[in-house]
C-alpha cells in the first residue's frame, strides 16, 4: 500500500467526514484516477519526436502511454485524420498514489520560481487540472538525455461533488496551493 493511500485511509477520510458532516463513509471524496496527457505538436513534422515523448511519459508514469490520434483533419495545423499528435496515460490504484506522492514531494519543489499551484484550476465538478511546463522536474527524466522540453497536463479526477470538497481532499494530501 502506498504512503498516501495509507494516510488517506487512516487520517484524511475521517477528517473530511467530520469537516463536511457526511453520514456514510462512502460519501467521503476520494481519488479516482490521474491522467497524464502530453500533446506533441512537433510530431506532425517528425515521427521520432513522438517516440521520445512516449519514452519520457513512460518514465514519469511507470507504465506505457497510449498514443492519441487526430479525430479529424485540420489544414491550418497541417494535421491529417488518424495522425499521432500526443500520448496519454491513466493511473489508478497504487500507481496513482505513488505518482501523486512523487509529484507533490519531489517534482513540484523542483519547478523554477515555484510559489504554489493555482487554487482556481477546478472544473466545478470536483476535479483538478494542473499544467507542467517542463518534464525535467520529474527525477526519472535525465536532463542530458532530453531532446526537447515538453509540457504535460495532469488531470486529477475525484469523487468530490464540489470544488471545496476536492480542494480539502488535495490540501489534506499536502498540495501546495497559493492561497
Swiss-Prot record:
GO biological process: translation
Pfam families: Ribosomal_L5 (PF00281), Ribosomal_L5_C (PF00673)
Xref: PROSITE patterns: RIBOSOMAL_L5
SUPFAM superfamilies per the UniProt record, alphabetical: RL5-like (SSF55282)
Gene Ontology cellular-component annotations: ribonucleoprotein complex; ribosome
Keyword Membrane (UniProt): no
Quaternary structure (record): Part of the 50S ribosomal subunit; part of the 5S rRNA/L5/L18/L25 subcomplex. Contacts the 5S rRNA and the P site tRNA. Forms a bridge to the 30S subunit in the 70S ribosome.
Family, per entry: Belongs to the universal ribosomal protein uL5 family.
Function, in words: This is one of the proteins that bind and probably mediate the attachment of the 5S RNA into the large ribosomal subunit, where it forms part of the central protuberance. In the 70S ribosome it contacts protein S13 of the 30S subunit (bridge B1b), connecting the 2 subunits; this bridge is implicated in subunit movement. Contacts the P site tRNA; the 5S rRNA and some of its associated proteins might help stabilize positioning of ribosome-bound tRNAs.
Designated name of the protein: Large ribosomal subunit protein uL5
Biological classification of the source: Bacteria, Pseudomonadati, Pseudomonadota, Betaproteobacteria, Burkholderiales
Gene responsible for this protein: rplE
Amino acid at each position: 500500500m502506498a504512503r498516501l493511500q495509507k494516510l488517506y485511509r487512516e487520517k484524511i477520510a475521517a477528517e473530511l467526514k467530520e469537516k463536511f458532516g457526511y453520514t456514510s463513509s462512502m460519501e467521503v471524496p476520494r481519488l479516482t484516477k490521474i491522467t497524464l496527457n502530453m500533446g506533441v505538436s512537433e510530431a506532425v513534422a517528425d515521427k521520432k519526436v513522438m517516440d521520445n515523448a512516449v519514452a519520457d511519459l513512460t518514465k514519469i508514469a511507470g507504465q506505457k502511454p497510449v498514443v492519441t490520434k487526430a479525430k479529424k483533419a485540420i489544414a491550418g495545423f497541417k494535421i491529417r485524420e488518424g495522425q499521432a499528435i500526443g500520448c496519454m496515460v491513466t493511473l489508478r490504484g497504487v500507481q496513482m498514489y505513488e505518482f501523486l506522492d512523487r509529484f507533490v514531494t519531489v517534482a513540484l519543489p523542483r519547478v523554477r520560481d515555484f510559489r504554489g499551484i493555482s487554487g482556481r484550476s477546478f472544473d466545478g465538478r470536483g476535479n483538478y487540472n494542473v499544467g507542467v511546463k517542463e518534464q525535467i522536474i520529474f527525477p526519472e527524466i535525465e536532463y542530458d538525455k532530453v531532446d526537447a522540453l515538453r509540457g504535460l497536463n495532469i488531470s486529477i479526477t475525484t469523487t468530490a461533488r464540489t470544488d471545496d470538497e476536492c480542494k480539502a481532499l488535495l490540501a489534506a494530501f499536502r498540495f501546495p496551493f497559493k492561497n
